[in-house]
Amino acid sequence: MTEADQVRKRINELYKKKQESGLTEVEEAERKELHKQFIANFRAGFKQQLDSLVIVDDQGKDVTPDKAKQIQKKKVLR
């Protein structure tokens, strides 16, 4: 199980507990921190996907914007 899976699992556990009986202050603080971590991981993964994206037109020609190509060259993706 990856770290992201563990974070997601713990968030879900805290959500269920909150629905059933409520959370203590410590648990609420943990939930907020886990949520921040989850969002940061999601954004990083999404940015990585966008950075590695190549856009191709109907004829198969690479029409990726120059700015995206520059980022890809810096990260040695091209």
Curated annotation (Swiss-Prot):
InterPro entries: DUF896
Transferase in keyword set: no
Source organism superkingdom: Bacteria
Locations listed in the record: Cytoplasm
Alphabetized SUPFAM superfamilies for the sequence: YnzC-like
UniProt entry keywords in alphabetical sequence: Cytoplasm
Family: Belongs to the UPF0291 family.
HAMAP family: UPF0291
Name of the featured protein: UPF0291 protein LBUL_1264
